[in-house]
């Protein structure tokens, strides 16, 4: 799981790329879970939280840019 400080240091474009990668990984993990091939169930939670952190950072930056 990415540290929040590491995510804050990234640019908006880098965050967008990271979000895409996390969503892709979440999709793959969901399929692995459905087929019973998931080796690390905790990874699902980590990915979900990282996605939430990225979206929160993007929303904060958007709000501060409009002020």
UniProtKB/Swiss-Prot annotation:
Coiled coil: none annotated. Keywords: Ribonucleoprotein, Ribosomal protein. Signal peptide: none annotated. The keyword Nucleotide-binding does not apply. GO terms for cellular component: cytosolic large ribosomal subunit. Pfam families: Ribosomal_L29 (PF00831). Belongs to the universal ribosomal protein uL29 family. NCBIfam families: L29. This is Large ribosomal subunit protein uL29. It comes from Zymomonas mobilis subsp. mobilis (strain ATCC 31821 / ZM4 / CP4). The lineage of its organism: Bacteria, Pseudomonadati, Pseudomonadota, Alphaproteobacteria, Sphingomonadales.
